[in-house]
Design a protein with these regions (language model features):
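Glycine/proline-enriched, intrinsically flexible loops and inter-domain linkers
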Residues: 1-599
Length: 599
């Protein structure tokens, strides 16, 4: 264990073997964010700190959303790695009291990996949540370290918003869902290391059951509707240990956990294995003792295992027992207070002259066709046509973007992050939506070897958010994406939520095509472009559609998807440009300096 000296100094004694196992999980990079939490505190934030980020949508509803990575598991076992990535992020949304409504994915691979695509489509289609958008980037940089970033979104009623912590001593914690096995043991530690060597084993990969997930979704939402849920956590990385300790540590409380009450799939598991297993489709619910029987009744009605697994105490101690024998007894807050690495003092430079880094041109349409993107009947704009657009029946609409610029990451991580955010804003504005907030997926190689690259990426994100006035609501960090010392490009994935007040803006069916904007990037021009994009997007009577494009291949794909078989002559652009393609009669509606190259 990397931090064992720090642990024993804080405990004031030698740590037991069981405690070392527990803190190895909780203080891993995956759970503890040792290298990134100093940077995360500097970000402009909103609705931050729960299982997922939240922003208000209207007077009655909130949106919960988050991006999560499952990179290491997908490299070792593509199908289960990708599938459980979908399942885990869905439960994060669910734990906020929201019904999951959409999934998007950002995939970076050296070739189309059928197992990853099948894992996402099989899980999402089976649980009835539409996969409404995404991006697919193909490059040899990701040969040994594919990136699988999944974004999930949900809508909840304001009165059903669930906190991610207990409220008082005397409450109980019910764990319900699927049975617990050995799959995923030390998965959090595995996800915090280089993929080289014997640790990259299938034992560390969780195995998903989408039908159990569907039952869990409906059971939990029924509990929420009946007012039974007073706090909730998904059982993801760190399993029972992580979920139950987080619930009490945030409230300066303690817990006594009874491990013999956890339903097992493998009856010979030892107490520590039960404590840290990352078996999927499980949740922890905080409730009052008098409500616990009804919580268990609902779970079992949906064919799920359930029992009171813990009591909330006022001691501040986290005590895990097995048949009355203490397994660990440590301060609950200590489990959550992983050591923090110092942040790197980075000073950005002027934006460089970027060169094109070739990513393979692919038609993502064949991937989208495997996804059920219309289930739920709330998908307004289907995949491949720019940002996804969803409706809330009886209310407004919202847009969903997931975007990255890995092609710029090696050249300058600061400006790559900055430009990724700006382009996400353009994409959101182009469908007539107002950006509300983002969720970030930080994908990086080895921060111990190259700390300046991580610092640059984080500062680029921070400064771009401040420039755009778009806060961060949630996020994820995946580090040590390396194989035999060779790492991926710094790859920031941004998921953006936007709000559409009116989904019924009339549109013409045809019109001329324009390239709008500037072929060279200048930051001071950006808000000029945004203002005009927003204005013409909302003036629907003369605009057929509008698309930001990040690369020429992206433009080509979107032209094909809207049925345009044409050669559009776009001026030769820099890799960082400020161009939007507009289909519609806008020439007389815009300032001359913004109209580019009418064809």
């Amino acid at each position: 264990m990397k931090y064992i000296d720090i642990l024993e100094r804080k405990l004031g004694r030698k740590a037991t073997k069981a405690e070392i196992e527990a803190f190895t999980v909780m203080w891993s990079e995956h759970c503890g964010y040792s290298h990134t939490k100093g940077y995360i505190r500097q970000l402009p934030r909103v609705g931050f700190g729960g299982n997922a980020g939240i922003v208000p949508l209207d007077d009655y509803h909130f949106i919960a959303f988050k991006v999560e990575s499952h990179n290491h598991p997908s490299a070792v076992e593509p199908f289960n790695g990708a599938a459980t990535g979908v399942g885990g992020i869905i439960r994060d949304i669910l734990a906020m009291g929201a019904r999951p409504t959409a999934v998007l994915d950002s995939l970076h691979m050296d070739k189309i990996t059928e197992g990853i695509i099948d894992g996402i489509s099989d899980y999402g289609n089976s649980i009835g949540v539409p996969t409404v958008g995404g991006e697919l980037r193909i490059s040899n940089y990701y040969k040994y370290n594919p990136l699988v970033n999944v974004m999930a979104v949900g809508i909840g009623k304001n009165e059903h918003l669930i906190p991610s912590m207990a409220k008082r001593a005397g409450q109980v914690i019910v764990i319900f869902g699927g049975a617990t096995g050995r799959d995923g043991i030390h998965g959090a530690s595995f996800a915090s290391e280089d993929l080289t060597g014997e640790k990259a084993t299938k034992l560390s990969i969780q195995v998903g059951d989408p039908f159990a997930e569907k039952m869990l979704i409906e059971a939990f939402l029924e509990m929420v509707e009946e007012g039974l849920v007073e706090g909730a956590q998904d059982l993801g990385a760190g399993g029972v240990l992580s979920a139950t300790s987080e619930l009490v540590a945030k409230a300066d409380l303690g817990a006594v956990v009874h491990l013999e009450r956890i339903a097992l799939r493998e009856p010979d598991m030892n107490p520590v294995e039960i404590l840290i297993s990352e078996s999927q489709e499980r949740m922890a619910v905080v409730t009052s003792p008098e409500k616990a029987d009804r919580v268990i009744e609902i779970a079992r009605k949906h064919l799920l295992f359930a029992d009171i697994a813990a009591e909330v105490t006022k001691t501040g101690q986290y005590v895990a027992k097995y048949n009355g024998k203490t397994v660990i007894d440590v301060p609950a807050k200590l489990l959550e207070e992983s050591p923090e690495e110092s942040i790197y003092d980075y000073t950005p430079s002027e934006m460089p002259k970027f060169s094109w880094i070739k990513f393979k041109d692919i038609d993502a349409h064949e991937v989208f066709e495997r996804y059920d993107y219309m289930v739920g009947t709330d998908t307004v704009v289907k995949p491949g046509y720019g940002p996804a657009v969803m409706r809330v029946k009886g209310s407004c609409g919202y847009s969903l973007v997931i975007h990255s610029r890995a092609d710029l990451g090696f050249q300058d991580p600061y400006w790559a992050a900055y430009i990724t955010l700006l382009e996400s804003v353009r994409k959101t504005l182009a469908v007539g939506a107002r950006p509300l907030a983002i969720t970030d997926g930080i994908n990086y190689a080895d921060p111990d070897v190259e700390p300046e690259g991580l610092a640059a990426q984080m500062m680029g994100l921070k400064n771009a958010c401040e420039f755009s006035n778009v806060p961060v609501a949630s996020g994820n960090a995946s580090l040590y994406n390396t194989y035999k010392g060779k790492g991926i490009p710094p790859t920031l994935v941004i998921g953006m939520i936007g709000k559409l007040e009116d989904l019924n803006v009339p549109r013409p069916k045809k019109g001329p095509v324009y390239a709008l904007g500037f072929k060279d990037f200048e930051l001071e021009r950006e808000k000029i472009l945004w203002n005009e994009i927003e204005r013409i997007a909302k003036s629907g009577h003369f605009v057929v559609s509008m698309h930001d494009f990040s690369t020429m291949s992206t433009l080509k794909s979107e032209l094909q998807n809207v049925g345009l078989e044409m050669k559009l002559k776009i001026p030769k652009c820099e890799p960082a440009h400020q161009l939007v393609v507009v289909f519609g009669d806008v020439e007389t509606k815009l300032p001359k300096e913004l109209i580019g190259y009418v064809r």
